[in-house]
Amino acid sequence: MSRACELTGAKANNGMAVSHSHIRTKKLQQVNLQKRRLWWEEGKKWVNIKISTKALKSIQKVGLDKFAKSNGVDLKKF
């Protein structure tokens, strides 16, 4: 399984590490992914999902069902 959020699709970002002498080297900025077991109210069941912390904060604010629908994700597959 890839290192991507299953709800938002967020994945690693290519960036540059810049030293004091301004030598630039490539680096990969990974997403802060967490494995969480969330209660899905509409489906009346627990959902195991790999999710970014940014998406987790949004879910706490608006709810899992509403957030999944806004991102076009079907929670039945989890």
UniProtKB/Swiss-Prot annotation:
Top-rank taxon: Bacteria
Keyword vocabulary terms for this entry: Ribonucleoprotein, Ribosomal protein
InterPro entries the record matches: Ribosomal_bL28, Ribosomal_bL28/bL31-like_sf, Ribosomal_bL28_bact-type, Ribosomal_bL28_sf
GO process terms (BP): translation
MF terms (GO), sorted A to Z: structural constituent of ribosome
A Pfam family hit: Ribosomal_L28
GO cellular component: ribonucleoprotein complex; ribosome
Family as reported in the entry's similarity comment: Belongs to the bacterial ribosomal protein bL28 family.
Protein's UniProt name: Large ribosomal subunit protein bL28
Organism: Prochlorococcus marinus (strain AS9601)
